[in-house]
Amino acid sequence: NTCSSTALLDECGVCGGDGSSCGGIDYCLDLHSGANLVSFYGLPDDASIANVMSSIEGIATGVIGEGVAANYNGSNWAGSLTIMSPISGYWVKVNDACSLCITDANPTDPSIQFELHSGANLVSFPVDGSVDISSGLPDDIEGSVSGIIGEGVAANNMGDAWQGSLTAFNGGKGYWMITTGSISFAYDVSSMSRIKFEDEVGLTAPDNKEVYQSIQQAFYFIEDVSLDGI
């Protein structure tokens, strides 16, 4: 991926770098009580679920990926999900607000390839930063992505523009990407900002009320509404 007219973004996320600056990175993802749709832009050599989730052991109750899942039984993780992947998104369920911290992680190569099947794919955004949807999806596959669902937000591909409450991909977030066929792509991060977009309108609640995020979500895009003949 290019990051300027003459330079390439290396696997460490450095514009014009030679890949030699990659040291282990430390970062944390802030989680609210309930289900959080996350991804990882760096994972340690030991990417087992027990190691990756060790900072919130006893607070995390389960992790759900696409077609895989694991539950914490009080002493061990059990289930079909055993290794965390930098290209996958995950629902992380916790019983209290906390920070999921990863130490000495290997930064994910920004040009990593995603192989998606037709339908819903639970994917990551593999870089610590933000890019708007249209810029982040290569032109040759953008038309094959009909919609994208995040945690409490969504965007619909209208052909000439994206509409909805989701406006950008953010590092650390997971996304359901809905495709009309099988595609292979890498995100275009040439216009990426290191400042994450926080303008999405997610779940809101009346005063003195709480909203608990569910892993089951539905979104509706309404083209026309007629009320009392208006």
Model-derived regions, located:
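Nucleic-acid-binding surface
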Residues: 222
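Extracellular calcium-associated, cysteine-rich motifs in secreted modular proteins
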Residues: 1-25
